[in-house]
């Protein structure tokens, strides 16, 4: 592993933070640091039982290492351990959250909005669908619709919220089919449609412009789940159509979810939910016998939304979560200070590098006669999937699993995914493909900026790993 800069970054910053509280009586230092060191060494050994998620040779799941500054800022904040539920628990970190969320909203083109961080994308999506249900009011049986390729959490969330849920079939590109969506909308019982910008399986981008056009005709909420793909809004020139057009109109959605702990270089868990209509804060209205006492005493922060009473807001007043780590807000704020969300900045260049790596890997795979690529074309974002040529879906799945294991033996870590066989080019054998037949495929998420520079080495290891299983 490379030398970790975090201890050095923390040393001076910790001194400065402690100086902020120097007027307080001193406390005795923690005792028995030898025993703590021993336990921490045991922790280090236990953590060695992990895949090397931080390394570019890990190209499997959606795992991107936090920026060193994010780790340092998070650790520094833990000296205070703020709780961003209320300002009583985190004054500075609440303000930093408001500022960081403002930057995220601005990336999507919103200057007026309601939003906050969450402990996960799941919680962020839950809040968005909860508001959709609340907005539907007393109309019983109003459904949530999402593509069959949307994250499974939407189905589970809808069940928790007791909202009927229906899946809309996807096309061979993994995008929601508009003809099937309109057939559901004609039934007149749809509260909201979930539009995914970057599906988990293949990074597909649902056709948001067409969904918005249907909203004008049928009247429903549009929730954009951009938990994975949201940050790629910064690199439109690196995207192809129709994905570019989908990102261009995201500001017209009713709500958006994005996960800074995916592409945003943040530690888990850091999600974010945004609402275009600030009046939807009314659905959150509640009081607490324990907190919110300081609202009227605090001066307003220049960038924060106002509470329902007109004073400075406690973030818990516009959130379903109660206790929530203020350190996550501190880490995100610090990262965005260093790497602003600018299309011409260093952060955006890193996103473009991952996208370029995915396109190059896809190009090489399409030139390999042993591979069946997606019929519909190249990756929309930075996720590559491919099927292995074989006489049957079962044999193809077995080969994929064998290569997956062989790659791991070569210190290259990929992922597996089950996809409809019909999404892939027909094999040379002329086999008949059944629409509902699933086949296990290889999958690579190339979300690290370093993946572009490491692609030759990734390819060399992949080819070496392929030699034994495919040659059998």
Predicted regions and their residues:
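Short glycine/proline-enriched loop/turn "hinge" motifs that connect secondary-structure elements
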Residues: 68, 157-160, 322-326, 428-438
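Buried hydrophobic packing segments
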Residues: 97, 101-104, 124-133, 154, ...
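Active-site nucleophile and cofactor-binding loops and adjacent substrate-binding regions
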Residues: 89-93, 115-122, 145-148, 196, ...
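Active-site C-terminal subdomain of aminotransferase-like
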Residues: 238-370, 374-377
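Glycine- and acidic
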Residues: 80-88, 110-116, 139-142, 165-170, ...
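Conserved PLP-enzyme active-site core in the AAT-like
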Residues: 7, 11, 120-286, 294-298
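N-terminal entrance/gating region of PLP-dependent enzymes' catalytic architecture
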Residues: 1-112, 312, 406, 411-414, ...
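Conserved PLP-binding catalytic core of the aspartate aminotransferase-like
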Residues: 373-413, 417
């Amino acid at each position: 592993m490379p030398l970790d800069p975090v201890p050095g970054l923390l040393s001076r910053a910790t001194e400065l933070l402690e100086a902020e509280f120097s007027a307080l009586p001193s406390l005795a230092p923690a005792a028995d640091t030898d025993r703590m060191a021993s336990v921490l060494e045991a922790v280090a050994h236990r953590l060695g039982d992990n895949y090397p998620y931080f390394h570019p040779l890990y190209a499997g799941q959606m795992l991107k290492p936090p920026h060193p500054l994010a780790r340092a800022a998070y650790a520094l904040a833990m000296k205070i351990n703020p709780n961003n539920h209320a300002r009583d628990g985190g004054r500075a970190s609440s303000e930093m959250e408001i500022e960081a969320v403002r930057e995220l909203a601005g990336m999507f083109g919103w200057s007026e909005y309601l939003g906050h961080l969450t402990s996960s994308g799941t919680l962020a999506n839950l809040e968005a669908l909860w508001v959709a249900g609340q907005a539907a009011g007393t109309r019983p049986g109003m459904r949530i619709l999402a593509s069959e390729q949307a994250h499974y959490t939407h189905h589970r969330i809808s069940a928790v919220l007791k909202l009927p849920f229906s899946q809309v079939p996807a096309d061979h590109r993994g995008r929601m089919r508009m003809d099937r969506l309109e057939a559901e909308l004609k039934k007149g019982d749809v509260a909201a449609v979930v539009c995914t910008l970057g599906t988990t399986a293949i990074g597909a981008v649902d056709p948001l412009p067409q969904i918005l056009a249907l909203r004008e005709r049928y009247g429903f909420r549009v929730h954009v789940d951009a938990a994975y793909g949201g940050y790629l809004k910064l690199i439109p020139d690196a995207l192809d159509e129709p994905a570019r057009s989908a990102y261009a109109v995201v500001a017209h959605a009713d709500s958006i979810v994005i996960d800074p702990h995916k592409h945003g270089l943040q530690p888990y868990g850091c999600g974010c939910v945004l609402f275009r209509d600030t009046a939807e804060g009314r659905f959150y209205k509640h009081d607490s016998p324990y907190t919110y006492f300081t609202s009227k005493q605090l001066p307003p922060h220049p960038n924060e939304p106002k509470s329902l009473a007109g004073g400075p807001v406690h973030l818990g007043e516009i959130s379903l979560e109660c206790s929530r780590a203020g350190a996550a807000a501190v880490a995100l704020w610090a990262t965005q200070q260093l790497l602003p969300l600018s299309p011409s900045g260093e952060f955006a260049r890193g996103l473009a590098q991952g996208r370029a790596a995915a396109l190059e890997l896809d190009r090489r795979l399409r030139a390999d006669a042993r591979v069946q690529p997606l019929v519909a074309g190249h990756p929309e974002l930075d996720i590559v999937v491919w099927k292995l040529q074989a006489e049957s879906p079962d044999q193809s799945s077995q080969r994929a699993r064998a290569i997956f294991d062989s790659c791991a033996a070569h210190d290259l870590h990929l992922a597996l995914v089950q996809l409809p066989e019909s999404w892939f080019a027909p094999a040379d054998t002329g086999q008949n493909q059944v629409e509902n037949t699933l086949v296990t495929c290889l999958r690579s998420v190339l979300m690290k900026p370093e993946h572009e520079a490491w692609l030759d080495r990734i390819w060399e290891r992949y080819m070496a790993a392929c030699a034994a299983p495919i040659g059998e």
